[in-house]
Amino acid sequence: MGKNEKTKKPKPKYNVWQNTAYMLSVAWDTRRSVPLLVVLLAVCTAGKTTAEMLISPAVLSKLESGAPLGQLLGAIGGFTILLFALTALCYYIDHLTMFGRTGVRMELLKRINTKRTRTSYVNLLDEAFRLMYQKGHDACMNNRASGEAFWKSWTDLLTNLIGFGVYLALLS
């Protein structure tokens, strides 16, 4: 093979939306709280970043308008309390989702192992089957594997979409 020849990657069997639908169905069947907590965490995080974004303009408007010191300190204190509350709520929700996500991951491992134990003996000798089994098993083995990263990615995507919507609403 020459340098100019491109090696084609095999096309994935399933697309992102099919994988998302599958993970949501597994989560809904095993731990219904996981998708709901992912959305709640995204809303909470977007609210926190919105409050962080609005604190400077609020304080500066108080300073520019010559508001009394009590109002200025009240605005700073109000935003501080709001940020503390939202940070604590986000932290709490993030820890709540950990148990559900682990349950979903265990269900995925159970399905992978069930597939392996119920397969034909010939497949157990097939190198391609064993590699696919190992790949699926590795995807669910720990908190940093893709079976767990799925939820973090979708939380981040939802947070960014909500934040973008808030930003657009503030600009209009």
Q: What residues fall within each predicted segment?
A:
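ABC ATP-binding cassette signature C-motif
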Residues: 87, 153-155, 167
